[in-house]
């Protein structure tokens, strides 16, 4: 039976708190629950009878994700179960007791997968290079295998609004493509459905909530400490935009849900040759339109 995490309680404070300060954590929790519930409803993330696997890393995002889903589970319009799963990648100095202790105290069903991906990544990736990509692939493979073996129907990840927007700019700047993170998707092999219930949640709100709830945060010493990573650079850019023009990142996030293919230039999404009649006429060879082409030189 899946246990329910109690509502956040006011944190102990040696100094008297004003009514406004006492209410703020409750307002934040309510705002987060509303955003998560809205995302679940908008994208049909959870269906009746789903077994949702919450991928728990020990960071603020995955703690908040688990907390929100446990709270929403009590009032959700459909029944679903939750299991928290952590992949112990055998990183040096990883505090292996932190997550089990926390999850047992909260009476949350959980499993710990032990797989030494750290040694693989350290052996394959040259020193000083970014480990994130290979680490992510190995982690994803282990979690997918667990989901397949345990009848999991939805895999919940802790990516938030800022992650999604940052991924959009990563693809734009470094791969010349318009792509981000889908709030809900089917894995490449078609076997798993991945959901991101924090898709509408700001990272700043998650950080404030994690601090208020005093989650036992586990830092990532494998990839998070590497400097000058492209994602960190994009993150700083977005933070600066938000400081200089509040609301800009919100606008970008909303734009990702309002795509106009006919106003872009992707020929696989829009029939440009079919515009203006003559759609059935054969198109001339492209070389005929190229200035300085071999065909032009042949005529000369």
From Swiss-Prot:
GO cellular component, one term: cytoplasm
Reaction equation(s) it catalyzes: cytidine(32) in tRNA + S-sulfanyl-L-cysteinyl-[cysteine desulfurase] + AH2 + ATP = 2-thiocytidine(32) in tRNA + L-cysteinyl-[cysteine desulfurase] + A + AMP + diphosphate + H(+)
Motif PP-loop motif boundaries: 57-62
Cofactor binding, per record: Binds 1 [4Fe-4S] cluster per subunit. The cluster is chelated by three Cys residues, the fourth Fe has a free coordination site that may bind a sulfur atom transferred from the persulfide of IscS.
GO terms of biological process kind: tRNA thio-modification
Pfam families: ATP_bind_3
Subcellular compartments: Cytoplasm
Keyword Translocase in annotation: no
UniProt-listed Enzyme Commission number(s): 2.8.1.-
Something else known: The thiolation reaction likely consists of two steps: a first activation step by ATP to form an adenylated intermediate of the target base of tRNA, and a second nucleophilic substitution step of the sulfur (S) atom supplied by the hydrosulfide attached to the Fe-S cluster.
Family that this chain belongs to: Belongs to the TtcA family.
Summary of the function given for this chain in its UniProt record: Catalyzes the ATP-dependent 2-thiolation of cytidine in position 32 of tRNA, to form 2-thiocytidine (s(2)C32). The sulfur atoms are provided by the cysteine/cysteine desulfurase (IscS) system.
NCBIfam families xrefs: PRK10696.1 (NF007972)
The protein, known as: tRNA-cytidine(32) 2-sulfurtransferase
Protein species of origin: Xanthomonas campestris pv. campestris (strain 8004)
Gene encoding the protein: ttcA
